[in-house]
């Protein structure tokens, strides 16, 4: 299945453009560019993404349900309307103890913070 961008210039309701699929994690690209991407996801109860790291910060926003985000072994419970920024280079897991839908936004700056 091809993961194409959401149609431009057309109104949509984010929570309605993705459905739950039993025993699955479903992802749909809203917009994807070389400088970053916005993705909407649905996680069925009991599903999770394996632990990973990203070279960029990730803005994660729950639009329906409740998500568990584990960042460097610290668990965060997010409910509808809540958000968290997953820091770049941090080990993290996204888990569905109950099903949820979310939006993830990654902006690829190409630069790490530099302290002087």
Predicted features by range, described:
Residues 73-88:
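Short acidic-glycine-tyrosine-enriched beta hairpin
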Residues 24, 39-54:
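Conserved short histidine dyad/triad with adjacent acidic residue
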Residues 1-35:
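A short, N-terminal "cap"/entry segment at the start of jelly-roll beta-barrel domains
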Residues 56-68, 72:
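Glycine- and acidic-residue-biased ligand/ion/polar-headgroup-sensing regions
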Residues 37, 66-68, 75, 91, ...:
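Structural motif
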Residues 88-112:
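Ligand-binding loop in jelly-roll beta-barrel domains
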């Amino acid at each position: 299945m091809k993961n194409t961008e959401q149609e431009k210039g057309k109104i949509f309701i984010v929570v309605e453009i993705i459905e739950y699929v039993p025993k699955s994690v479903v992802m749909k690209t809203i917009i994807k560019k070389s400088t970053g991407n916005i993705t909407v996801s649905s996680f069925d109860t009991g599903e999770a993404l394996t632990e990973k790291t990203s070279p960029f910060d990730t803005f994660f926003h729950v639009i329906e349900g409740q998500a568990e985000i584990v960042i460097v072994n610290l668990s965060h419970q997010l409910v509808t309307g809540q958000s968290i920024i997953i820091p770049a280079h941090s080990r993290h897991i996204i888990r569905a103890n109950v099903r949820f839908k979310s939006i993830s936004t990654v902006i690829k700056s190409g630069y790490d913070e530099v302290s002087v």
